[in-house]
Amino acid sequence: LTQIHEYKGEQALFIEAKADTLTKLVEIAKIQSTEASNKIEGIYTSNERLKKLVQDKTTPHTRNEQEIAGYRDVLATIHESFDYIPPKASMILQLHRDLYKFSGASYGGHYKTLDNVITEEDEQGNKTIRFQPLPAWETPEAVDSLCRAYEEAVGKGDMDPLLLIPMFILDF
């Protein structure tokens, strides 16, 4: 962690000296992040369409592309405004709303209303429960509690935020 914090000072110099290179790397990272994150959810499009969607050079034609466009916009919001995005339930719901804004999905920006399980299916078609999320009725309080706990831990200053952030993500 100490090395990471030391390099943060050098990062500003590197950004200034190599701005064009970093801009290109950020664009590549956005495309790769969008592709990987959407593939996990079973959302696909062609590489050419993906690149154009991420660069906002075309409009989405399919439901998959609508979800990719929403992801692109949320990722852009996070990249451009991360210093101003508090870890609060209302902000998480706002980002969730924006994620689904192209698809017209009514659940965007709302907590789930039905219980669900994450299953996996083997080659023979047998399903097993991979993960069982909280029941729908517990979700709002759990998100509020997680956000409060994170902010309290950061406020105390006892732990480095670089350790708290992945803990928050894992618990989320």
Model-predicted segments: where are they?
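FIC/Doc superfamily catalytic core
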Residues: 1-172
